[in-house]
Design a protein with these regions (language model features):
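Single conserved hydrophobic/aromatic residue that forms the stacking wall/gate
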Residues: 1-13
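Eukaryotic scaffold repeat domains enriched in small/polar residues
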Residues: 17-410
Length: 410
């Protein structure tokens, strides 16, 4: 349940929002945002939801066998550009494939040279409007490459006050970043997120042109012996066509922007009473309390927008990410169930299920692309989509055609 401080803020967020549920199938310009992701009655069920709840059809793209990609891991990163070329980060490299899945090239080399990357930190940042990619070069600087692999220069990640910037998105001529935290002293009263959740800089003059306020900055905890947070901290983000969605991992509002200057609250999570809140999560993060002190308490993890609703991951605070329950909540309806079992594939007989939104995926132009390990096609009840596919083959790219909004189909 929510603590009193966070609850007051949360209630203020919801005031005036619920009418959106009565208008959800109208044109976006006519709908009162944000949409409510209502999980207040969410139950955990062994019965999985269906891919057909949000997708109309499924197809498959065979990737070249060279270079060899190891068995799919959660560390993979997937991107598809406006020409449907495919980019897969595996280990220290980013591989480019054409729309048919044929390998083209690696976009940069690993090494000590001025145009090379020593060791990439995190995932690459793609700019779909200006067709380039940013790579965090060992935390020293960000290197920029065109999507053809041409080196375009670099810029430092540390400002004049020794603050480290971590860039996570790029839209038009602007970059979105957050400042990495300064390690607090034991006993210090702190909100590790700071007064702003993220910042936007202009690429033309390297100036900060927007700051997203942290409206829960007044909630603080006492630094204990350690810091503890998951690899997703502090932000979830999705770039879908011209829209960028951002949410702090401990907060309830998902913001949407098309220009990185105007951020609209697009979705708000309405929690179940068993869910934890920002105050408890911040206390756990800075070591003011331990996860074992909040057994049986749950958290909403990833939320991935789709045209007709959202995919979400949900789990006990003491559980592992890979063990998250997953579900789909249709716009205007309540999320009633989530399941530890993957979404059942009722669109064809090649694949039994898909572990969305936890598996590696990317959305563009009404399609959801998902990387799937080949052993999944050899489970009982499944069959490979290609006759020469083996369990040792490179992963297959699944292409789900997503259902459209009502206003787009009438």
């Amino acid at each position: 349940a929510l603590s009193s401080a966070a609850s007051d803020v949360y209630k203020r967020q919801l005031i005036g929002c619920t009418p959106a549920q009565k208008q959800v199938m109208q044109n976006d310009a006519e709908v009162q945002h944000p949409y409510i992701i209502d999980m207040s009655e969410l139950e955990i069920s062994e019965t999985p939801q269906m891919l057909s709840d949000f997708a109309d059809s499924i197809s498959y793209i065979r990737l070249s066998e060279e270079p060899l990609l190891p068995e799919i891991a959660l560390t993979f990163h997937l991107y598809v550009d406006k020409n449907e070329n495919i980019y897969i980060k595996e280990g220290s490299l980013v591989y480019k494939y054409n729309p048919k899945g044929e390998f083209i090239k690696s976009l940069f080399n690993v090494g000590q040279g001025p145009k090379e990357v020593i060791l990439p930190f995190g995932d690459p940042v793609y700019n779909s409007e200006q067709q380039f990619m940013l790579v965090n070069n060992y935390g020293v600087n960000f290197k920029q490459y065109s999507l053809e692999g041409t080196y375009m220069g670099d810029f430092r990640t540390i400002d004049s006050l020794d603050n480290h910037k971590r860039f996570i998105a790029s839209i038009e001529d602007k970059d979105v970043f957050y400042y990495e935290y300064h390690y607090p002293k034991r006993g210090e009263e702190i909100n590790l997120d700071g007064p702003y959740l993220w910042y936007v800089r202009s690429r033309s003059n390297d100036s900060i042109i927007y700051k997203m306020p942290n409206h829960l900055f007044h909630i603080k905890a006492t630094k204990g012996m350690y810091l503890a947070f998951g690899g997703e901290y502090p932000l979830y983000y999705n770039k879908i066509d011209s829209n960028l969605y951002m949410r702090h991992v401990y907060q309830d509002t998902i913001f949407r922007t098309t220009d990185a200057l105007k951020w609209e609250p697009w979705y708000v999570i309405k929690h179940h009473q068993r869910d934890t809140d920002y105050a408890n999560l911040m206390a756990i993060t800075v070591g003011d309390m331990a996860k074992r002190d909040v057994e049986g308490v749950y958290q909403v993890f990833e939320v991935s927008p789709l045209p007709t609703g959202v995919l979400f991951a949900y789990n006990d605070l003491n559980g592992w990410r890979k063990d998250c329950k997953t579900g789909f909540c249709k716009i205007g309806e309540k999320a009633l169930t989530c399941s530890p079992n993957s979404f059942k594939n009722d669109l064809d007989d090649c694949l039994k299920s898909i572990r969305l939104p936890l598996c590696c995926h990317f959305q563009r132009n009404g399609y959801l692309y998902v990387l799937i390990s080949t052993p999944d096609f050899f489970e009982e009840g499944a069959k490979p989509p290609f006759p020469d596919l083996t369990e040792d083959s490179n992963p297959v790219l699944v292409k789900l055609k997503l259902k459209k909004r009502w206003k787009e189909t009438n």
